[in-house]
Amino acid sequence: MWMKIQRVKTVIYSVSLLVAASSLMPIANAAEKLQITLRVGAYFRAGHVPDGMVLAQGWVTYHGSHSGFRVWSDEQKAGNTPTVLLLSGQQDPRHHIQVRLEGEGWQPDTVNGRGAILRTAADNASFSVVVDGNQEVPADTWTLDFKACALAQEDT
């Protein structure tokens, strides 16, 4: 059983000098509510982008009883790996950037086939959204749209 689902959505931009929306977006802040925060990283240029380049850093917080967290996106998966996404440009849907969700202890969610799971009773967990593979990225705008939930104790 999944509980306390929240969603965070932000936009990354690529222009000649890729402008990334540097924002901190808390979704909720009450003690028993799930919080998901996504902060987009520094500016980068359209063109060659190296594998592993961090595009955004995310945090999930839940102070209630739980056994872990799940973070996922409804964006198109790239291949068979649940943590890899293929984002389409907003200005031109033929423009793509392939990204992956990663972080210490996070594992691909092979049961649901989307996103990643972290088994932990800790109140906080962090994750990163990084470029998946060396790519030539055109100037465009992409949306990062992630959802998160805390896993109920019986989900372990």
Regions found by a protein language model. Name each.
Residues S14, A116-L118, S128-V129:
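Generic hydrophobic alpha-helical membrane-segment signal
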Residues W2-V15:
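Bacterial N-terminal signal peptides that target proteins for export
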Residues P26-N29, T37-G41, G68, H95-R100, ...:
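A generic short-segment signal for beta-strand/edge and adjacent turn/coil regions
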Residues V19-I27:
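C-terminal segment of classical bacterial N-terminal signal peptides
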Residues S16, A20, K147:
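A conserved short alpha-helix in the GNAT/GCN5 acetyltransferase fold that borders
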Residues D74-T120:
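Mid-chain, structured segments of secreted extracytoplasmic proteins
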Residues A28-Q91, N124-V137, T141-T143, K147-T156:
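N-terminal small/polar-rich segments of proteins
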